[in-house]
Every structure is written in C-alpha cells, then in structure tokens.
Amino acid sequence: MSDRRRIVRAVRGIRGEVEFEASVEPRFDYGRRSHRLHVDGTAAVFEANDQRLQLTSVAALERDSDDVRSRFTVRAGDTSGFVLESGASGSPHQIGDGEVIRLFLDTGAYWQRWPEQSSYRGRWREAVERSAITLKLMIYAPSGGLVAAPTAGLPEQVGGSRNRDYRYTWVRDGAFSVFALLGLGFTEEATVFGEWLRARVDERAGEGSGPLKIMYRIDGSSEVTEETLDHPRRLHGLASGADRECASDQLQLDVYGEAMNSIHALDSGALRDWGVGHEGWQHIVAMIDWLCAHWHDPDEGIWETRGGRRHIVYGQLMSWVALDRAIRMAASRSRPRTWTAGAARGTASTPRS
C-alpha cells in the first residue's frame, strides 16, 4: 500500500480583502534531523535521509531559512491553497486553484458519506459520529494499527515533565476501539485492526516472555524504547520536551483479556473476510496456555506502575475474560479446549492485592 498522504488547505475569499501569510515548518525525527530544502516558484521539497515532503501552492513560495512562507492577497471570489504530500516521488507538478478546491471538496464529501454506514440511531448522534470519525483518523491504513492518541508532547499536567508521545498502538486501547466501531456498525475498520491484532498473536506464539507486548509501533514492529527528548524549544514558558512513551517490556496481564474479547467479538460476528483458521487457532491456544501458567503472577498492571510488580485484581479478572472468550470460541467452532477447569479454579483463587 502506498505511503502517500496529503494535507490540503484551501483559502477562499468571501468578502472584502485579506492579506494572508502561510508558513510550512517541518521537523524530522522530533526535530533532531536537519533537512534539505529546494524551492522553485510554487513548489518546495523537504528531504531528510529517506523522508520526503513535497509542497505545492497556488501562490508563490519563498524560502525562510529551513522553512517556506507564502504571502498573498485574497479578495472576494478568489481561491488559493496548498497541498503538502508525503511519500511522493519525482518533481512537484503545478497546482491550480481548481485542483485545490476539487481535492478539498472530494475530501469533505468522503467524510460526509462515511458516517452514513453507521447503525447508531440513539441520542447525540452527531457527537457519536464525530467521535467515530476521530477513531477512524487514528487508524494507520498501511498496517491497520490504531494509535492510542494523536498527540506527541501534550503534558499530563501543565508545567509537568510527563509529555508523552502516544502515537503508538496499545493492545488495550485498540481493543476498546474495536468494540466501539463494531457497536456503531463500522465493521471494516474494526476488522482491519482485528487483522493487525491477530498478526501480533501469530508472530509471537510460543515465545517465553509471553505472546503479546502491551504496545507496538503502528507498523506492528515491537522495537520500542523509551527516550527523553530534551532539545525542543520552550513553548509558552513551559518545558516542551517530549518523552517517547515506553512501557513495552512491562507485564500487563489485562491486555490478554482485552485482546481475546476483541478476537471473540470479530470471530462470532460472522464478518466477511474474518475468521480464525487452524493455524491461527493454534497460536491462540499457545497464548492461552501461557496465560494459564502466568495469570496469578504479579504485574505492572493497567496503571503501568514503575515501582515494581504487584497483584492487581483488574489484570487477573481480565485474564479470566481471556480464558472465557477462548472457551466460547472453542465451543462455537467445535475446537479443542482444555481451559475450562482452569477458568473455574481462577474464579475462586484470585490473589488479593
């Protein structure tokens, strides 16, 4: 699948006359990597190693150090705009005001049509549909990964130090989103993340450290390390350094319950192009077998504690959910099952915190 993505900005004059100034200031690798810039009339190309951004404009562009600016006047009836594209190769093509408006209107039309497939007919429908649109925008289409939040440095507390980059995929957050999307009738988006999740189960089946990581990069890779970025400039007098979030090596037992809850929902929903085959079922069996051996272990839990592992009831409850959903899947498809007794024992022997 192509990694080409475009941001379209259209400027239309309604009445009067307005002096307009626009700037494009990209920063690669959290601002740590310098880039090359080439500006030619109404086009500009930003390049940093293997990353490339291409900017085309109706109005003329001018270089401002490593950035690009455009100054123009908009009068009633005038149209101008910009297209910023990633992944494009070759030289930028000249773009006219008509093409900018077409791209803008086509994009708007798509997002107006998309909620029509929703099955939701309850109260506050507009707010619900806007929330669904936000969830869809958080899906990385090439892989199906769903980011926990589209933020990269908002502080948990004003003036605080925990400015996390949440543009990673947490199994827990993604699983919750599957249920939200399924409940609203957006089965395609739910299925896409289900495929992403099933691939993670398949690739880690039988590994001694546990079949699942709690979080991944959006492309599905698990090479995630925590890193503090001290170099960003101060913003509004507050420290704006960002932390690349990482608790990826923690044990959080609840993710198995959330993952299996989602897989069961998709498997039992008779969705087109979804199904757990023989090999996939064997990988699920390996995951549940591992969980049966470890679900009474202390863990860092849903709160990602940094002070050592402890028994957390929520994680052990969700471990039971994982066993329950696996048993249901086995029963509904006449698959082998061996965990019924383990699930029954677990309800009577959950350790206290």
Pin down the residues of each PLM region:
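Acidic, mature catalytic/reactive cores of soluble proteins
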Residues: 1-353
